[in-house]
Design a protein with these regions (language model features):
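Phosphate/oxyanion-binding loops and surfaces in catalytic or ligand/nucleic-acid-binding neighborhoods
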Residues: 62, 66, 95-99, 113, ...
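Helix-turn-helix
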Residues: 12, 20-54, 58
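Short coil/turn segments at alpha/beta junctions that flank glycine-rich nucleotide-binding fingerprints
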Residues: 23-27, 78, 99, 144
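Hydrophobic alpha-helical bundle segments that form small-molecule/ligand-binding pockets
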Residues: 117, 127-157, 163
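Short helix-capping/turn signature of helix-turn-helix
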Residues: 49, 108-114
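Hydrophobic/aromatic residues within well-ordered alpha-helical segments
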Residues: 52, 59, 63, 67, ...
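Hydrophobic alpha-helical connector segments
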Residues: 72-104, 125-127, 133, 153-160
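Generic hydrophobic, amphipathic alpha-helix propensity
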Residues: 9-17, 34, 59-63, 67, ...
Length: 166
């Protein structure tokens, strides 16, 4: 691992940590295995991330960032409201199937009652653009008489995510 390319080093560490945490959970994950898989030493992991819990948070944030980027790439704002909601449901289902590590990371974090995500400065900001798009779809659908009035976009997204998750 090159010391002269911090971004690349962090990317390798996050990739290795994602695999480790997805397989073993936070409690079973070992920094030694993450370092070996990343081609780094433990000191480098601690230098970039401080401790295992902060590395886990970084993995969660990176995982959420990936799904949010993919969701925003759907361009739901360009679709008919019903098509947009349907597209988001289909995408969410497909994403979970293609990225089972995302669900196992969520399982691990759920066991800790979202302790790590609550400390994140970035997670809420990641959700906002998607919720705004979903709110717009719902309002457009409501005005067109296709959706009932008063659907909460946050609750709808939680329902969509839960359908794919469970």
């Amino acid at each position: 691992m090159s010391r002269r390319n911090p971004a690349r080093n962090q990317e390798r560490i996050l990739k290795a940590a994602t695999a480790e945490f997805a397989r073993y959970g936070l409690g079973g994950a070992r920094v030694d295995r993450i370092a070996a898989r990343a081609g780094a030493n433990k000191r480098m992991l601690y230098y970039y991330y401080g401790n295992k819990e902060d590395l886990f948070l970084a993995v969660l944030e990176a995982s959420y960032a990936r799904i949010r980027r993919a969701e925003l790439g759907l361009h739901l704002e360009d679709l008919d409201p019903a098509q947009g909601v349907r597209r988001l449901v289909e995408f969410t289902w497909d994403y979970y199937l293609k990225h089972p590590e995302f669900l196992t990371l969520l399982n691990s974090e759920n066991l800790h009652r979202a302790r790590h995500l609550k400390r994140s400065r970035d997670i809420a900001a990641m959700h906002s653009p998607l919720i705004a798009l979903l709110r717009d779809l719902l309002l457009r659908g409501e005005r067109a008489g296709r959706f009932r009035k008063g659907v909460d976009p946050v609750q709808l997204y939680i329902s969509i995510a839960a359908l794919g998750y469970f």
